[in-house]
């Protein structure tokens, strides 16, 4: 069904960032069962048991359906956050479930979404009859998700290689910034 799973993951991840800043344990306790646990349990249930990746959903840009690196990374980060919330509240079984699932998602990201040949993370993968079909579009959200949600450290060779590859391919934009992905025409202005 048409969902955008990163929207679920980002709420849980952001709540952890809020907690790190506020230390408002009472608030977290008040929303743990109704929001954090329900969202985390959904993410655990929405994993492809054969690959370890989240099941397909729409990407960050709401354009393509599949398993994007950004979404998989956000699910990883959210499950780690859910594990931390569970530990904080003494819910050992929940913590174990969320952390174990997050570790499987991380392994699957590195197995299915990294390209040794291209030296970058794929935008997306789909599976047909068990075989991966890759979308090799250079998408800056892919590498952003990898280091933002701590799948890999920013100095990890895969992250460094991805950034170098993207810089080489994308070039520089005269006014600064980078395109969302290769071939992006969102708000593109003519050079005429």
PLM regions with names:
Residues 1, 68-73, 88, 95-192:
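Extended ligand-binding clefts on enzyme/binding-domain cores
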């Amino acid at each position: 069904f048409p969902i955008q799973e990163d929207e679920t993951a980002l709420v849980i991840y952001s709540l952890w960032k809020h907690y790190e800043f506020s230390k408002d344990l009472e608030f977290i306790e008040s929303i743990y069962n109704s929001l954090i646990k329900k969202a985390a349990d959904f993410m655990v249930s929405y994993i492809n048991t054969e690959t370890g990746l989240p099941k397909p959903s729409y990407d960050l840009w709401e354009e393509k359906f599949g398993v994007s690196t950004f979404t998989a990374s956000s699910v990883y980060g959210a499950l780690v956050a859910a594990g931390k919330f569970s530990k904080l509240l003494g819910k050992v079984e929940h913590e174990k479930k969320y952390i174990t699932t997050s570790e499987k998602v991380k392994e699957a990201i590195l197995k299915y979404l990294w390209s040794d040949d291209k030296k970058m993370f794929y935008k997306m993968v789909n599976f047909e009859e068990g075989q991966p079909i890759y979308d090799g579009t250079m998408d800056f959200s892919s590498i952003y998700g990898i280091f933002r949600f701590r799948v890999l450290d920013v100095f990890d060779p895969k992250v460094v290689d991805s950034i170098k590859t993207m810089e080489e391919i994308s070039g520089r934009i005269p006014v600064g910034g980078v395109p969302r992905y290769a071939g992006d025409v969102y708000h593109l202005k003519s050079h005429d």
